A protein has these predicted regions:
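Extended, low-complexity, intrinsically disordered C-terminal regulatory tails
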Residues: 8-44
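Catalytic cores and adjacent binding grooves of peptidoglycan-active enzymes
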Residues: 5-9, 32, 40-45, 49-53, ...
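N-terminal, Lys/Arg- and Ser/Thr-rich interaction peptides
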Residues: 1-3
Length: 105
């Protein structure tokens, strides 16, 4: 699901894959994108490059939230950063091997 008003134009294919995996990790809970290439983020945020999205967490309790977060982090692997923020889970495609970038493809 995508929150009303969220702009997903410009998301990279990697983020589409990440969202598909996130939906499986959320299981019985709704997996809602609350921010993508829209919104206000830090000046060097990967949101502006289409390489990050935020997922809603307000409907998850403590144990459920931790379970989803840990499963997502494990499932996405080391090419993605998964950060548990106070009101969302931030997911970004940030491969550590910088020899190949989106622009090179």
């Amino acid at each position: 699901m995508i929150k009303s008003g969220v702009d997903i134009r410009g998301l990279t294919p990697q983020m589409a894959i990440a969202y598909t995996i996130a939906c499986r990790c959320y299981g019985q809970y709704d997996c809602v994108i609350t921010s993508a290439s829209d919104g206000k983020h830090g000046p060097n945020s990967l949101h502006y490059k289409g390489q990050a999205l935020d997922l809603r967490t307000r409907h998850l309790n403590g144990q459920g939230l931790q379970a989803v977060y840990l499963k997502l982090k494990e499932s996405l692997g080391e090419q993605f950063d998964v950060v548990l923020e106070s009101d969302h889970i931030h997911v970004e495609w940030d491969p550590k091997d910088k020899s190949i970038s989106v622009e090179d493809r």
